[in-house]
């Protein structure tokens, strides 16, 4: 992509904010090819296979969203476009350190996006649309229109009204606090904005009538005060932060020949089936057949189970959560049927419970309480003498631990952020570069971490090393780093 040498003043300001405040690039689980593939299937689209997808991210920053995806999707290809040369260089250094060959970052302005980039199965623009000018918004949708594969999907996130009306009041307060303060650095402006915000909030809390009338504002203000400085600087002090109503975004899509609600090519729209969104059709055979094709991951915990009115459905979800939260509908139905039999309920009660189960699953698929996949991320149990950690994952963690954590988070197989990747993780992963006996690994752990501590007895050192081993094998399973020679699923 050709480098832009005539960047606008607002872009210069944005880059100055990035440099002064820093920025940590996040992974986002709802942007992965596996999730977008499933979302397309949910509404009847024959989306490209996630395993071999070609993915473009616009506004990729350091690449924290797609680098982690590239780690877990070795046959897919990822390209990120980012305006900041500094972020591209640092992100590409992390890619190099991680020894990844299926992801790259390119410096450039999307206004100069080159046609030679080709087509992509999935296009991501997370945290981008609301922070750019109207001209760039049009260009973003033009890029998607021209470069999205015929059956591909684009993911575009944006700030929406009416929710952002309250948050916008906080932004305006931040901007007001820094009026005529051009001499301050952006870090100083964030501090000043937070200070003024705290003073305003404290004054409101002194008066019961004001506190009651401004409860939404106080909630938004409290949320912002607790955020990191870089977040406050980017969300509330950048020159562009342009929320819109959902219908306004849809109208913008329509102007670029996209379908409303799901960003796909008009040629693919004929296959879209919106029955899944109609509560009256949730228990029809076509919708049940679609739901039965997914593997699910529950995101809520047992404390939230009271939201289910049907006791059998509540018991089913409780059992699924206790079993790890991953399930398909055959497993869920078997648990529900067992709960029905254990309760000695009448046969007339079973079908209503099944209907309630499907309704609950679909509702939480839409609301985000349950993730769903056609291609479920690989997660294997650790087996002594058979399991190991492939170099692909170890190199990624090494790149994060040895400097990359300043700019991005690590991520697990679902692309959820890992905020606590450590040298201990790296040590364990390097020890398990191939299948080894438990005793061999524990001996190495003891030598590396505990043998220098002369205050501990040998017995105590052995116990600590074994506890470390047990904890880390479970952690590696949970993160999706474990592979086994026996299963042949080596990455």
Task: Describe these PLM feature segments.
Residues 20, 24-52:
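Conserved alpha-helix/loop element of class I SAM-dependent methyltransferases that forms part
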Residues 138-150:
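A short glycine-rich, Lys/Arg-flanked "PGG" loop and its adjoining helix->strand segment in the class I
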Residues 259-264, 299-491:
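Long, charge-rich, low-complexity alpha-helical segments
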Residues 114-123:
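A short acidic, Gly/Pro-enriched loop at the edge of an enzyme's catalytic core
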Residues 151-159:
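Conserved beta-strand signature within the Rossmann-like core of class I S-adenosyl-L-methionine
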Residues 223-325, 333, 339-350:
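C-terminal lobe and adjacent flexible extensions of AdoMet/dcAdoMet transferase-like proteins
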Residues 62-75:
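Conserved SAM-binding loop of SAM-dependent methyltransferases across substrates and taxa
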Residues 158-183, 203:
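Conserved class I S-adenosyl-L-methionine
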């Amino acid at each position: 992509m050709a480098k832009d040498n005539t960047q606008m003043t607002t872009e210069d300001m944005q880059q100055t904010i990035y440099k002064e405040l820093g920025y940590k690039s996040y992974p986002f689980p709802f942007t992965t090819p596996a999730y977008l593939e499933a979302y397309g299937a949910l509404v009847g689209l024959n989306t490209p296979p996630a395993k071999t997808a070609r993915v473009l991210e616009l506004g990729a920053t350091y690449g924290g969203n797609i680098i982690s995806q590239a780690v877990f999707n070795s046959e897919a290809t990822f390209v990120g476009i980012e305006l900041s040369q500094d972020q591209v260089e640092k992100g590409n250094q992390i890619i190099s350190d991680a020894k990844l060959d299926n992801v790259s970052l390119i410096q450039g302005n999307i206004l100069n996006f080159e046609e030679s980039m080709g087509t992509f199965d999935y296009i991501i623009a997370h945290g981008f649309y609301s922070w750019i000018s109207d001209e760039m918004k049009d260009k973003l949708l033009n890029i998607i229109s021209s470069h999205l594969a015929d059956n591909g999907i684009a993911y575009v996130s944006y700030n929406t009204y009416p929710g952002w009306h309250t948050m916008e009041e906080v932004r305006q307060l931040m901007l007001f606090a820094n009026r005529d303060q051009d001499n301050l650095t952006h870090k100083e402006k964030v501090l000043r904005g937070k200070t003024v915000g705290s003073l305003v909030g404290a004054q409101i809390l002194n008066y019961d009538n004001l506190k009651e009338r401004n409860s939404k504002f106080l909630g938004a203000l409290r949320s912002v005060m607790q955020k990191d400085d870089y977040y406050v600087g980017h969300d509330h002090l950048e020159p562009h932060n342009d929320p819109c109503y959902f219908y306004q975004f849809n109208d913008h899509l329509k102007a670029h020949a996209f379908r409303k609600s799901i960003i796909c090519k008009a040629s693919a729209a004929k296959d879209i089936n919106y029955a899944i969104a109609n509560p009256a059709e949730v228990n029809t055979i076509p919708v049940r057949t679609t739901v039965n094709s997914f593997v699910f991951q529950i995101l809520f915990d047992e404390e939230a189970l009271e939201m289910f009115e049907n006791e059998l459905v509540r018991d089913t979800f409780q059992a699924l959560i206790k079993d790890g939260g991953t399930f398909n509908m055959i497993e869920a139905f078997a648990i529900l049927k067992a709960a029905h039999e254990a309760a000695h309920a009448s046969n007339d009660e079973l079908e209503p419970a099944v209907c309630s189960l499907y309704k609950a699953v679909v509702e939480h698929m839409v609301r985000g309480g349950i993730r769903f996949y056609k291609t479920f991320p690989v997660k294997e149990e650790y087996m002594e003498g058979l399991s190991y950690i492939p170099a692909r994952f170890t190199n990624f963690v090494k790149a994060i631990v040895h400097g990359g954590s300043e700019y991005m988070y690590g991520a697990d197989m679902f692309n959820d952020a890992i905020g606590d990747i450590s040298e201990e993780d790296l040590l364990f992963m390097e020890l398990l570069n191939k299948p080894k006996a438990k005793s061999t690994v524990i001996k190495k752990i003891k030598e590396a971490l505990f043998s220098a501590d002369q205050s501990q007895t040998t017995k105590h050192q052995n116990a600590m090393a074994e506890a470390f081993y047990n904890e880390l094998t479970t952690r590696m399973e949970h993160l999706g780093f474990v592979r086994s020679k026996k299963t042949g699923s080596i990455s």
